[in-house]
A protein has these predicted regions:
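A short beta-strand motif characteristic of beta-propeller blades
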Residues: 23-24, 99, 117-120, 164-168, ...
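Signature of short aromatic-glycine-proline-rich micro-motifs recurring in repeat-based ectodomains
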Residues: 14-39, 115-132, 178-187, 191
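Non-catalytic accessory segments flanking enzyme active sites
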Residues: 45-48, 54-55, 81-87, 101, ...
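Predominantly five- to eight-bladed beta-propeller fold
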Residues: 2-36, 43-114, 302-317
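Short loop/turn segments that connect beta-strands within beta-propeller blades
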Residues: 93-96, 158-161, 205-209, 256-260, ...
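Short consensus segments that form the blades of beta-propeller domains
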Residues: 25, 76-82, 120, 142-146, ...
């Protein structure tokens, strides 16, 4: 790796988040650089950002131990010309060579190199390799315009270093983006988009041609939980679909890649946090509301309950006189929109 990194133009990390005392204490310490490796560990990619011309901003921590401390960091205020300049570098580990990729598309753009989703079975492993999203020959990254209205999902060829936009989003409003889901190593991509006014998933081929919209309707899809490539089923979380529920409550769903067979897996008027095994066979569903005892159950991938797992014991809490808050729903001033809230009353 080149040794020309300097403060605010360094590889992988610029030291942001340190106060004035920590800057002095850590001046000679080696810093961890965030890199993403190819699956065969022959290459790695790292981002570099040049913020040297960006003006300083400050935060004073007045509640630190002893004297207040000062944190200085780079921040572009609205209307200022100088912006951070993001770069992506690709390195050949054996050859000890690297090159800056030509990622230019938008003025003052921001970049995001996507990592491979972690396996749930690796959750408790002390060492978990940081791999890029892709394979030994390619990886995926995103670039976003400064005004947040243009986004490219790109694929990078490792050998040539060329960058190809696969999916492009162009709107007159703020655009959000998520890491794409790869099917069969990138032969197909599952892309999250708000192009129809709601957050939904879309199926693209490897060249960026839209095959079909997977989910649709007046609800918000949140995250990809699992992709069953063989069965061509997508498991995902969403909210706002179930009638007469708080629209902020999350649920787990399954749907076929062609958009058919949409099914709610963890029914119940609760906020759900679901964890699925890597083989997409079973789900641990934790659920509760602010006025209920948290519970967890084991489900299969069709939503059938296999067994009860745990119910939280709040008996000691209740002996203190604790009372659950009370959820409520009222109409907004327009007389149509429901507003959800929680009322906390004194215990006495």
């Amino acid at each position: 790796m080149p040794k020309d990194g300097v403060k605010y133009y360094s590889f992988g990390s610029d030291g942001s988040g340190e106060n004035n005392e920590e800057v002095i204490k850590n001046d000679r310490k080696r810093r961890r650089a965030f890199v993403l490796w190819s699956p065969d560990a022959k290459y790695f990619v790292i981002q570099r950002s040049d913020s040297r011309k960006v003006k300083d901003l400050w935060v004073i921590n007045s509640v630190s131990a002893g004297r207040p401390t000062l944190e200085t960091y780079k921040y572009q205020m609205p209307g200022e010309a100088e912006a951070p300049k993001d770069e992506v570098w690709l390195f050949d580990f054996a050859a000890k060579t690297g090159k800056k990729l030509n990622v230019a598309a938008f003025k003052d753009q921001s970049l995001n190199t996507y990592s491979k989703p972690a396996l749930n079975s690796d959750r408790d492993n002390e060492f978990r390799p940081a791999l890029w999203l892709g394979d030994n020959n390619k990886f995926y990254m995103g670039r976003t315009s400064r005004d947040l209205k243009r986004i490219d999902i790109c694929v990078v060829d490792v050998k040539s270093g060329t960058i190809k936009p696969v999916i492009e989003e162009r709107f007159n409003t703020y655009v959000e983006v998520q890491r794409p889901g790869l099917v069969n190593g990138g032969k197909e991509l599952i892309h999250w988009s708000e192009r129809d006014g709601w957050g939904h998933f879309y199926l693209f081929d490897e060249n960026g041609k839209l095959k079909n919209q997977i989910t649709k309707g007046s609800f918000h899809c949140e995250d990809i939980v699992n992709i069953d490539e063989k069965a061509r089923v997508l498991y995902f979380t969403a909210n706002g679909r179930e009638a007469k529920e708080d629209p902020y409550y999350y649920h787990l769903y399954r749907v076929n890649f062609d958009g058919s067979g949409l099914k709610l897996l963890n029914a119940g008027d609760f906020d759900h946090a679901a964890s699925m095994n890597d083989e997409a066979k079973y789900v641990v569903d934790n659920f509760s509301r602010v006025n209920t005892v948290p519970k967890s159950v084991l489900l299969d991938n069709l939503g059938n309950k296999v067994m009860d797992l745990e119910t939280a014991d709040l008996s000691l809490l209740m002996t203190t006189g604790y009372k659950f808050p009370e959820p409520f729903k009222v109409k907004a001033d327009d007389g149509v929109t429901d507003i959800y809230g929680v009322m906390y009353k004194p215990f006495n």
